[in-house]
A protein has these predicted regions:
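Conserved acidic carboxylate
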Residues: 9
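Two-component/phosphorelay signaling modules centered on CheY-like receiver
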Residues: 12-33
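Acidic, metal-coordinating helix/loop segments flanking the phosphotransfer/catalytic sites
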Residues: 33-53
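Acidic catalytic/metal-coordinating carboxylates
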Residues: 36, 64-67
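The short loop immediately C-terminal to the conserved phospho-acceptor aspartate in CheY-like receiver
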Residues: 58-59
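Short amphipathic alpha-helix used as the core "switch/output" element in two-component signaling
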Residues: 66-77
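Alpha4 helix (beta4-alpha4-beta5 surface) of REC/receiver domains from two-component response regulators
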Residues: 88-105, 109
C-alpha cells in the first residue's frame, strides 16, 4: 500500500524525478502536482482526507510554500507535510516548523534524508508500531 502524496513543485524536471524516485524507493504515490500556492492549497483542501503526505517547495510560480504549509495546519495527525527547498537555512527551518512542517529538507544535500523519512512514513502506515525513530531536521 503506497503513501498517497501531493507535490507542490514548480520545476517540472524536479517534479518528474521526485515522483519516479519516491514511487520506486519509498512506495510514495504522488497523485497530484501543483506549481502555485493557489493550486496546492485548493487541492489539499478539496481532498483533505485523501492524502498522507504533502511535499512542498518554498518558491513556487505564484505564492509561497509557506502559504501552502499554513493552510495545512488543521490537518489530521496522520497527515505529514514536509518542506523541500534549496533555501533550508536555520531561519527557514524554524519558520516552517512554526507553521507546522513535520520536517524540512535541503534539495541540494538532503534528498537521501527525505527518502528515508518517506520510507519511514510508509512503514508506519503499513505497521503503526514500525519506525519508532524520528528524523527531525
Amino acid at each position: 500500500m503506497s503513501l498517497i502524496s501531493y507535490l507542490a513543485e514548480d520545476n517540472e524536471a524536479i517534479a518528474r524525478n521526485l515522483i519516479e524516485t519516491l514511487q520506486e524507493i519509498c512506495e510514495v504515490k504522488v497523485v497530484a502536482v501543483g506549481a502555485t500556492q493557489t493550486e496546492a492549497s485548493q487541492w489539499l483542501a478539496l481532498h483533505d482526507s485523501e492524502w498522507d503526505l504533502a511535499i512542498v517547495d518554498l518558491f513556487l510560480k505564484e505564492g509561497s510554500g509557506l502559504g501552502v504549509l499554513a493552510g495545512c495546519r488543521n490537518r489530521s495527525f496522520r497527515q505529514k507535510v514536509v518542506v523541500l527547498t534549496n533555501y533550508a537555512t536555520p531561519e527557514i527551518r524554524k519558520r516552517a516548523t512554526e507553521l507546522g512542517a513535520n520536517a524540512v529538507f535541503d534539495k541540494s544535500s538532503e534528498l537521501e534524508q527525505l527518502f528515508a523519512y518517506c520510507a519511514e512514513q510508509t512503514a508506519q502506515r503499513l505497521d503503526p508500531g514500525a519506525g519508532s525513530g524520528s528524523l527531525l531536521h
